[in-house]
Amino acid sequence: MTVPPPLVVITGPTATGKTEVGINVALACGGEIVSADSMMVYRGMDIGTAKPSASEMRGVPHHLIDVVDPDEEFNVARYQQLAGEAIVGILGRKRVPLLVGGTGLYIRSVVEDYRFPVRADRRLRNRLQEAAELYGCARLHRHLAVVDPVTARRLHPNDQRRIIRALEVYYQSGIPFSRYPDRRDRAPKYLPVMFGLNMERGRLYRRIEDRVDAMIRAGLVREVQSLLEKGYGPELVAMKGLGYKEIAAHLRGSLTLEEAIHILKRNTRRFAKRQLTWFRRDEQIRWLDVEECGGPVGAAREIVGSIEQE
């Protein structure tokens, strides 16, 4: 039996330093990074997504960054395909693939080799979106609870995009989304070596607030204004990302800048908490406290040491 190739995964909640740690690990072990961030795939959305600059990448090849325009559809199935192709290329160059980011579903789709049940049906999706607008997303969530209670319990009643996707799967296949992916009787594609970065909650929240302030100073308002002027409206999935929806609301006059910043910090803290809840369920992840490791360089050193022992 062929031993699957190793895949190093570095994940954790936002603002824990995953990007910097990943770059340091890649430099130490001859690796290339495959981004696992659902917002970094969009071109022109740089400040609000905390994309690393060319100088910050320090010569480390990065994949799955700047893949599509903000008005193009991009989903986990497409991510899985492109990430898989990138990993094959990295392995072919005899280098180490590192999956780095905080989008749990993207990571799981690669590590667990998801089999996606059905392709998106544009007409069905439009009908479900119209129903959500007419009756409210909570009503769709209640319906999902009838046909797929497992998925309904996992999703927030206002998570319209994922609720609609789960209903799409059910209506098209007759099978609840919670029964996918089915990877039984299949050999694993990779041997995942997974690390989670974290830190004391108060420290993490202060880092989140400092990062939001830094984004504002770096020109986040100008970035969002430019996107809106190019015709990328607030209804787009990309424009509903953290930082973009709050600043867009400010630019429409719904919020003052101070209010938008306050809400963005609050929403990011809540997002980090949800990320941590998601990742804590994965027993494969080895957790590292970045502060206890002495910062990103120390955390990278710990990871490299663990990889060498595998």
Swiss-Prot record:
Entry EC no(s): 2.5.1.75
UniProt keywords, alphabetically: ATP-binding, Magnesium, Nucleotide-binding, Transferase, tRNA processing
Region (Interaction with substrate tRNA): 37-40
GO terms, molecular function: ATP binding; tRNA dimethylallyltransferase activity
Sites annotated Interaction with substrate tRNA: T103, R125
Similarity field: Belongs to the IPP transferase family.
Quaternary structure annotation from Swiss-Prot or TrEMBL: Monomer.
UniProt xrefs under PANTHER family: TRNA DIMETHYLALLYLTRANSFERASE (PTHR11088:SF60)
Name this protein carries in UniProt: tRNA dimethylallyltransferase
Originating organism: Desulforudis audaxviator (strain MP104C)
